[in-house]
């Protein structure tokens, strides 16, 4: 392992010990915000520190085995050869693990996520598939013990959704779901198709991270145009009698957000503002990402809706993930929420890209 990497790991080990000592300090325990922040830092350091300690032990085992090679006893030398072989293999394994643990982490990975699903080309069939994707994400959220909340929806005439925005709350939600942004294409025979012909439809998905209130971009109220209107969604007669639905337009960017899922205008406005903040932040994030990643590709889609990321072929039971040339013949399982079969290889490829970039930087 490079000396610069060893020094970085030694610094993290030292910081881990400092944080542990601080967590036992009475003044820190009395300050809930600081205690919470240090506890989070300690848990983030724990895995890499444990890996580095194991690496140090494997290095000590290797050094010890090398000393045993100097023994006169042939049996001891043979044993030393075996121990050296095992220690070298362990060092290689741990070095690979530590390299991944040291990769720069997206600070937003642990935040909640907003998913926008919009029907594109394909009319009714696209809206129906948007509903299928919503169900797929709901199942995936359930498997991860995340909470899903519908922020806004516009139902399709024959089922599904023309557009639906949901909030996914839970640890690591954005970190996993961010890979879903992009164009999703479906190929299947619609129920209304009497000739059995396969139709192609498109749905776009945009995933954004929730912006914590403390970090939210300052939005000037003068830049907002707020309209109220009567909700057209479900919710009972009360909804249709009052102008509880909200449409907010951010004039500088042209971003428009509608929320009509709640009975209360106040709640709809609060939800619309949180989605608006996420959208504005997403625009800023993309500007930064474009500047940082202009020299290398990224598997995390920019939200460019023309970028096709995945095709779902129902007649063949096939899912094709175009970004990494992955083909799976387990469409039913994926549509039932088994997204890890796709997301895990995507994350691994993303890590490989980051490692390659890191190697280039280190020369």
Swiss-Prot record:
Methylated by PrmC. Methylation increases the termination efficiency of RF1. The keyword Metal-binding does not apply. Gene3D superfamilies: 3.30.160.20, 3.30.70.1660, 6.10.140.1950. Residues 284-296 have a biased composition (Basic and acidic residues). The modification N5-methylglutamine is found at residue 237. One of its GO terms (molecular function) is translation release factor activity, codon specific. Disulfide bonds: none annotated. One of its GO terms (cellular component) is cytoplasm. PROSITE patterns: RF_PROK_I. Belongs to the prokaryotic/mitochondrial release factor family. Peptide chain release factor 1 directs the termination of translation in response to the peptide chain termination codons UAG and UAA. This is Peptide chain release factor 1.
């Amino acid at each position: 392992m490079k000396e610069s990497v060893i020094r970085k790991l030694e610094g993290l080990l030292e910081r881990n010990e400092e944080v542990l000592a601080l967590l036992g300090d009475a003044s820190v325990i009395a300050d809930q915000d600081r205690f919470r922040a240090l506890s989070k830092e300690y848990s983030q350091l724990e895995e890499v520190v444990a890996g580095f300690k194991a690496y140090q032990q494997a290095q000590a085992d290797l050094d010890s085995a090398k000393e045993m090679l100097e023994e006169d006893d042939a049996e001891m030398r043979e044993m030393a050869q075996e121990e050296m072989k095992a220690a070298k293999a362990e060092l290689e394994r741990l070095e690979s693990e530590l390299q991944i643990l040291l990769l720069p982490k997206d600070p937003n990975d642990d935040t909640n996520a907003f998913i926008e699903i919009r029907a594109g080309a394909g009319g009714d069939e696209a809206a129906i598939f948007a509903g299928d994707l919503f169900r797929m994400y709901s199942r995936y959220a359930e498997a991860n013990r995340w909470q899903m909340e519908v922020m806004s929806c516009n139902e399709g005439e024959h089922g599904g959704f023309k557009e639906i925005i949901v909030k996914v709350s839970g640890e690591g939600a954005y970190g996993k779901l961010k890979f879903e942004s992009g164009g999703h294409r479906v190929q299947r025979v619609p129920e209304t198709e009497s000739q059995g012909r396969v139709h192609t439809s498109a749905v776009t998905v945009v995933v954004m991270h929730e912006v914590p209130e403390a970090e939210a971009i300052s939005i000037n109220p003068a830049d907002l145009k707020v309209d109220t209107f009567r909700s057209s969604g479900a919710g009972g007669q009360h909804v249709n009698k009052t102008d509880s639905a909200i449409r907010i337009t951010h004039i500088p960017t042209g971003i428009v957000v509608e929320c009509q899922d709640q009975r209360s205008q106040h709640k709809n406005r609060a939800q619309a503002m949180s989605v608006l903040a996420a959208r504005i932040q997403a625009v800023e994030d993309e500007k930064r990402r474009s500047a940082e990643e202009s020299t290398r590709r990224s598997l995390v889609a920019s939200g460019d809706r023309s970028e096709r990321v995945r095709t779902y072929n129902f007649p063949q039971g096939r899912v094709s993930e175009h970004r990494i040339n992955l083909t799976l013949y387990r469409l039913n399982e994926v549509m039932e929420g088994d997204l890890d079969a796709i997301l895990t290889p995507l994350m691994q490829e993303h890590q490989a890209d980051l490692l390659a970039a890191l190697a280039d930087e280190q020369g």
